């Protein structure tokens, strides 16, 4: 009997030891990522950033492993993620495309991370540019953290301005400066155009105006600031005399200005990619023009990451989310191996990043001071469920209104009624 107890004890102890020994490897987190750049530019280093972050994370937390499915392209990522969600197999932590955030938040796919941010002593929202952090909010709660951001700048065709005997504007230029130069360019030659791809929403941002309320229940097209912004866009559009400027004309060097993201600038300004695009003329970038030196902003695009609301390991998932979006080493590698910039103020303003950008841009007007200024006052797209539909409705009607002989103010009021009806259906 005693021998039986001894053998049984050994077996139980062995099983217990095996369970304990294996415990550190029992938690596996799945990460959802896509290959390449989020910004539509060439990039082959996206996994280098992720793999480095995972390696550091697993060293910090030896009881947790991280896996991800490679080879998913950005164009396929939304479908891949939605299929996972439908099957109840969504990753614990995953990237969120800008167009998907409102939907994922509204259907409850993302975990509310307010309490994690509040109670984590190693985390502070003050570390982020507030404008970029806001990209992850929905209904006044935080559902995602910014992983990488991409502010909008203004492309300037320096060669064309020189041909027209126009001086390069400064970074503190205004909408009046922008319009004046576009007008001079259009008058100098019938083959030249002042701008390409500058939209009514760019003008809204430049005036610091608000098209919708935060809840997404009201549209403000008839408010004075919005009307001034749209009227400026209408006046600017009239310079083209009905001609729709094309991307081909822009790439041939026939256009003075066009909004351009930092990612495109960082990709095509330095060698070797410089010879692939915009190589037939000299160009640079400036801050987007605003209504005045103290008023207005520009759009910033943000790649977000969030936690699944159904994750069985939310504490570990939060730590992984922090490793990707809040760890300074990871964030520094994003600026090094990707084309956007870190949403963390300390990283974006670090000497390492300053030196990196100086090496890339040379004698350009782009500087960390300019980027810091752009990010401090940047604006994200609105975060409510019907935003995309409401914006499409305005887009569709805006060009018709601009070219119509109908009363412009009455047309705006009528469009506002239509949008408000849609928002409250």
What function would you assign to each model-found segment?
Residues 1-103, 107, 292-295, 316, ...:
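Conserved N-terminal structural module of periplasmic/extracytoplasmic solute-binding proteins
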Residues 70-80, 173-179, 241-252:
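Short helix-initiation/N-cap motifs at beta->coil->alpha
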Residues 92-95, 256-261, 266-267:
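Paired acidic/hydrophobic, glycine-rich loop segments that form the ligand-binding mouth/hinge
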Residues 139-147, 152, 176-219, 225-226, ...:
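Extracytoplasmic/periplasmic solute-binding protein
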Residues 286, 336-400:
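Long, aromatic- and glycine/proline-rich binding clefts that accommodate carbohydrate-like moieties
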């Amino acid at each position: 009997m005693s021998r039986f107890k001894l053998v049984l004890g050994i077996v139980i102890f062995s099983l217990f030891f095996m369970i304990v020994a294996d415990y550190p490897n029992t938690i596996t987190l799945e990460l959802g990522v896509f290959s390449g750049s989020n910004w539509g530019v060439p990039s082959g280093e996206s996994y280098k950033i992720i793999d480095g972050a995972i390696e550091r994370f697993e060293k910090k937390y030896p009881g947790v492993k991280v896996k991800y499915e490679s080879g998913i392209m950005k164009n396929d990522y939304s479908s891949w993620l939605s299929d996972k969600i439908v099957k109840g197999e969504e990753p614990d932590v995953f990237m969120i495309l800008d167009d998907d955030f409102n939907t994922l938040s509204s259907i409850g796919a993302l975990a509310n991370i307010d309490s994690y941010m509040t109670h984590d002593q190693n985390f502070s929202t003050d570390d982020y540019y507030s404008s970029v952090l806001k990209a992850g909010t929905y209904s006044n709660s935080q559902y995602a953290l910014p992983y990488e951001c991409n502010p909008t700048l203004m492309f300037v065709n320096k060669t064309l301005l020189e041909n027209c005997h126009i001086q390069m504007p400064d970074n503190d230029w205004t909408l009046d400066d922008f319009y004046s130069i576009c007008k001079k360019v259009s008058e100098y030659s019938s083959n030249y155009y002042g701008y390409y791809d500058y939209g009514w929403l760019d003008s809204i941002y430049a005036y610091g105006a608000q098209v919708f309320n935060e809840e997404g229940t009201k549209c403000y097209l008839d408010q004075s600031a919005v009307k001034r912004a749209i009227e400026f866009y209408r006046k600017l559009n009239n310079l083209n005399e009905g001609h729709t400027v094309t991307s081909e004309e822009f790439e041939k060097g026939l256009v003075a200005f066009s909004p351009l993201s930092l990612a495109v600038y960082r990709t095509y300004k330095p060698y070797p990619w410089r010879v692939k695009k915009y190589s037939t003329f000299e160009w640079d970038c400036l801050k987007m023009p605003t209504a005045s030196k103290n008023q207005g902003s520009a759009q910033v695009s943000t790649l977000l990451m969030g936690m699944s609301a159904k994750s069985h390991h939310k504490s570990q998932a939060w730590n992984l989310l922090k490793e990707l979006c809040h760890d300074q080493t990871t964030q520094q590698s994003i600026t090094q191996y990707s084309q956007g910039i870190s949403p963390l103020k300390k990283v974006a303003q670090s000497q390492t990043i300053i030196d990196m950008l100086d090496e890339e841009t040379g004698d350009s007007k782009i500087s960390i001071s300019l980027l810091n200024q752009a990010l401090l006052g940047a604006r994200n797209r609105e975060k409510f469920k019907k935003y995309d539909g409401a914006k499409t409705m305005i887009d569709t009607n805006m060009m018709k209104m601009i070219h119509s002989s109908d009363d412009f103010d009455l047309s705006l009021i009528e469009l506002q009624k239509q949008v408000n009806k849609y928002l409250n259906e």
